[in-house]
Amino acid sequence: MTTTADPSSAQVEIASAQGVDYTLYDDVLSTYVDDSGWVNYADLQQSRQALDTFNNGLATVDDATLSSWSEEEQIAFWINAYNSLTLKSIVDQTPLKPSIKDITGVWRLRKHPINEKEKTLNNIEHDVLRVDFDEPRLHAAIVCAAISCPPLRNDAFTGENLDAQLDEQVEQWLARPDGLKIDKAAGEVKVSKIFSWFGGDWIPSYGVDSGFTGSKEEQAVLNFISQYVSDEDRAYLEAGDYQVSYFDYDWTLNNQQ
């Protein structure tokens, strides 16, 4: 059985020339997401009006308003939209699915009203965020509702705080058991599978001609990661005397236990 948003949910204007009012979305995150990024989907499913009202408001953001914002504000908008619509996709299912991958067409087929258009989650990630902005840290911020995803923040991204928030996200992501492991004794550096899937996104800003190891994509990823580790680990990564491998990806729902 699939549940949908209450059709009586109000469609509110959430945006202005100054940016987006994230009050409703902040309330959702602070209430149902813990400090480790796990989500209480069962409770959210029972009290989803704020989430639905915010998501309905995404449809009212027009191109003129969106284009008037700073790049940081635009990135924050699209990241928040991706994450809030992912939450919707999960709680639309009754009973809750064990994994987002159990929801047919969740990324490619299910369309959501946003920016006076209809977009899938794949459209937001691959046709907007990854195309319009040179910001590979977005991969630490968009959360696909799986255990191996980066942690979901329990506050909204904002244009004003985006740079610091993205750095925090990277640090928390790499600190996870399947984010980064540097094993000097074994000569192995193991990183999230996300870096394998989207390694090319790091080349424009972090590509290098020497140092590190592996393919051009892996060198760029390792250069990026080196900005977030100790000086000792940075020197080890730059030396390149190790093998790169990737953690298996756990698609189990990032549900609070």
Each model region followed by its residue ranges:
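Interaction/scaffold regions that mediate signaling and macromolecular assembly across diverse proteins
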Residues: 2-79, 83-257
